[in-house]
Amino acid sequence: MAEKRNIFLIGPMGAGKSTIGREIADRLHLEFFDSDQEIERRTGADIAWVFDLEGEEGFRKREETVIEDLSEKHGIVLATGGGSVISTNVRNHLSARGIVVYLETTIDKQVARTQRDRRRPLLQTSEEPRTVLENLAVERNPLYEDIADIIVQTDDQSAKVVAHKIIERLDF
C-alpha cells in the first residue's frame, strides 16, 4: 500500500468524513478536499441548489467529475459524498488511486448528527429521515464495504481518536 499516497474517506452522511478528513490531513501534512465543497466551489452554488436545479442525476454527474479530477492528485485526503459510491467509475477511481477508508456509523448516530442540517437534500423529503437513512444504508453499505481497504467505526469517538486509529493502520 505504500505507493497509495491518497486517502479517500467514504461512508454515509453523518459519519464524520469531513471532520475526520481534516484531522488526518493536518496530522499527515496532506492537502484536504471535500467533494461537496469542491462542487459548490465549481458551480458557485450550494448542493441543495444543484439538487433542485439538476436533480440527483445531475448532481451525481458533477460529483463523479469532481472525484475523478481530485483523485488524480497525489498526497491528498478526500472526503467523498455519501452517495458517490453508487457510481462504478467513482468506485474504480478511488480503489485504483488511493487507500479507501470506510467510516462506519449506526443509523442512530446518523439521525443525531444530521437532524438539524438543512443542507442535506436527500433528507429534505416527506419521508422520515430515519427511513431515508435506512434505505440508503441497504443500498450503499455493501458498496462501501466492497471497496474499503480500512473500515473504522466512528460512533462514540472523537474525530481525533478516529483519525489516530486510521493513521495507525496506514502503510505510509
UniProtKB/Swiss-Prot annotation:
Catalysed reactions listed for this entry = shikimate + ATP = 3-phosphoshikimate + ADP + H(+)
Under which pathway is this protein filed? Metabolic intermediate biosynthesis; chorismate biosynthesis; chorismate from D-erythrose 4-phosphate and phosphoenolpyruvate: step 5/7
Which residues of this UniProt protein bind Mg(2+)?
Answer: S18
The record's principal subcellular location, in a coarse class, is: cytoplasm
Q: Does the keyword Ribonucleoprotein apply?
A: no
The note on the cofactor says: Binds 1 Mg(2+) ion per subunit.
Q: Which Pfam families match?
A: SKI (PF01202)
Q: Where is the signal peptide?
A: none
Gene3D superfamilies xref list: P-loop containing nucleotide triphosphate hydrolases
Q: Which InterPro entries match?
A: P-loop_NTPase (IPR027417), Shikimate/glucono_kinase (IPR031322), Shikimate_kinase/TSH1 (IPR000623), Shikimate_kinase_CS (IPR023000)
Its BP terms in the Gene Ontology are:
amino acid biosynthetic process; aromatic amino acid family biosynthetic process; chorismate biosynthetic process
Instruction: List its EC numbers.
Output: 2.7.1.71
Assigned keywords, A-Z: Amino-acid biosynthesis, Aromatic amino acid biosynthesis, ATP-binding, Cytoplasm, Kinase, Magnesium, Metal-binding, Nucleotide-binding, Transferase
Q: Does the keyword Protein transport apply?
A: no
Binding-site residues, substrate: D36, R60, G82, R140
Q: What does this protein do?
A: Catalyzes the specific phosphorylation of the 3-hydroxyl group of shikimic acid using ATP as a cosubstrate.
Q: How does it assemble?
A: Monomer.
Q: What HAMAP family would the database entry show?
A: Shikimate_kinase
Q: What is this protein called?
A: Shikimate kinase
The top of its lineage is: Bacteria, Pseudomonadati, Pseudomonadota, Gammaproteobacteria, Alteromonadales
